[in-house]
């Protein structure tokens, strides 16, 4: 596994924005990936070869999808070694759920462990200081759940208070931040470890004309893990990155079939409706307005152009529809598009990668003494099965203060 982390910005200049007492902050971020790096240019030939498929129409469709996703690289658990050990995974109609879960359960725990350790190292605290664990995954099914397996792998206290969010899909990372925020603000002194971990191996299958949605997954989704330490009232040695204010979850009635996944003996069967970008476009502005109204001081003085946007990149069409609906210039979703390009849609993990990109952008602007101003306020957004919208109004505590009259 490959892991990395992002914590406070290494700069002689202290944070320009002071945190508010009692408000939850993201104190550190981290991520980890499996060893298999997939270059998008080689996906089509490799996938068709590994699944023994020579259908020219399916190959042409997958080729087109791989270009339109804008993904360049991804990491995946699936490997030639796994296919040699479990050739039935690439065969149509084989009951392989047990094999898939055996592989997935082990992989998500390993990735979550490495991402968590990277995050804690960046934070600078000790694992013994972690009071709560929030674990998010849509890639496993077992009990005890992955939250306990992760707590044991990390050597956390048996008294650590655990929460697991399962099958929340792409909205799971922001949902986890929302839960971590609530815990941090309601339990003085709490330090909450959020970990997300996902793999596509549960849905890997040979292509079929009857399942065109499978090819979307092949072209778009990636594996990995993310982590964050969340706590209120940072100590002098902690370096908070983002302060979390109002949080909102909303499901859209009568849209539950738009993102649909069913566990079967052959793995998960996934369907993604073509109407998803249009549904998000039609509902995102009202959701953002509601989020901002929860904090009137921010709502009164902010326009969309004044804000940063940390958006889960479900796909390029979703980002483009959002830009058009909200009137955002192309640079506002740069962190999201970069995450999609480098890691694909890694489900719940991806929002961590987006936030890390934003931290890095802020660091680079400071080092280069760029004239471009940092946005203090912004929204962290994701969209998942339900259709469920998750959002948090946040402050970038690493932002440089705007000049005021």
UniProtKB/Swiss-Prot annotation:
InterPro entries, A to Z: Chalcone/stilbene_synt_C, Chalcone/stilbene_synt_N, Polyketide_synthase_type-III, Thiolase-like
CDD domains in UniProt: CHS_like
Residue ranges, annotated region (Disordered): 1-20
Molecular-function annotations in GO: acyltransferase activity, transferring groups other than amino-acyl groups; tetraketide alpha-pyrone synthase activity
Family annotation (Gene3D superfamilies): 3.40.47.10
Keyword Magnesium belongs to the record: no
Function statement: Plant type III polyketide synthases (PKSs) that catalyzes the condensation of fatty acyl-CoA with malonyl-CoA to generate triketide and tetraketide alpha-pyrones, the main components of pollen exine and potential sporopollenin precursors. May be involved in the synthesis of sporopollenin precursors in tapetal cells to regulate pollen wall formation. Required for exine and Ubisch body formation in anthers. Does not possess chalcone synthase (CHS) activity in vitro with the substrates 4-coumaroyl-CoA and malonyl-CoA.
Protein name: Type III polyketide synthase 10
UniProt gene name: PKS10
């Amino acid at each position: 596994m490959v892991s990395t982390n992002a914590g406070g910005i290494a700069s002689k200049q202290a944070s320009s924005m002071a945190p508010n007492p009692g408000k939850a902050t993201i104190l550190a971020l981290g991520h980890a990936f499996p060893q298999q790096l997939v270059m998008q240019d080689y996906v089509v030939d490799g996938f068709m070869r590994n699944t023994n498929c020579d259908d020219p129409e399916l190959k042409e469709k997958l080729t087109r999808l791989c270009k339109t996703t804008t993904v360049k690289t991804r990491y995946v658990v699936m490997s030639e070694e796994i296919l040699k050990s479990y050739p039935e995974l690439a065969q149509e109609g084989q009951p392989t759920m047990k094999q898939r879960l055996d592989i997935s359960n082990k992989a998500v725990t390993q990735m979550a462990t490495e991402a968590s350790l990277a995050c804690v190292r960046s934070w600078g605290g000790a694992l013994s200081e972690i009071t709560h664990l929030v674990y998010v995954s849509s890639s496993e099914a077992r009990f005890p759940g992955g939250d306990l397996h992760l707590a044991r792998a990390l050597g956390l206290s048996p008294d650590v208070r655990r929460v697991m969010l399962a099958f929340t899909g792409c909205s799971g990372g922001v949902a986890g931040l929302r839960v971590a925020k609530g815990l941090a603000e309601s339990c003085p002194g709490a330090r909450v470890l959020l970990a997300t971990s996902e793999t596509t191996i549960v849905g890997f299958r040979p292509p079929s004309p009857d399942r065109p949605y499978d090819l979307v997954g092949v072209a778009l989704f990636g594996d990995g893990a993310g982590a964050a330490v969340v706590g209120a009232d940072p100590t002098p040695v902690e370096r908070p990155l983002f302060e979390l204010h109002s949080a909102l979850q909303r499901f859209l009635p009568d849209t539950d079939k738009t993102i649909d996944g069913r566990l079967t003996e052959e793995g998960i069967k996934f369907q993604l409706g073509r109407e998803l970008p249009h549904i998000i476009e039609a509902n995102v502005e009202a959701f953002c307005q509601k989020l901002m109204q929860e904090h009137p001081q921010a709502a009164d003085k902010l326009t969309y152009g004044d804000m940063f946007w940390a958006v889960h990149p479900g796909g390029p069409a979703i980002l483009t529809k959002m830009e058009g609906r909200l009137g955002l210039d192309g640079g506002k979703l740069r962190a999201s598009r970069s995450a999609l390009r480098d890691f694909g849609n890694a489900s719940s993990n991806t929002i961590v990668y987006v936030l890390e990109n934003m931290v890095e952008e802020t660091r680079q602007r400071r080092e280069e003494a760029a004239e471009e101003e940092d946005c203090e306020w912004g929204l962290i957004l994701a969209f998942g099965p339900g259709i469920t919208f998750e959002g948090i109004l946040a402050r970038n505590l690493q932002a440089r203060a705007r000049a005021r009259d």
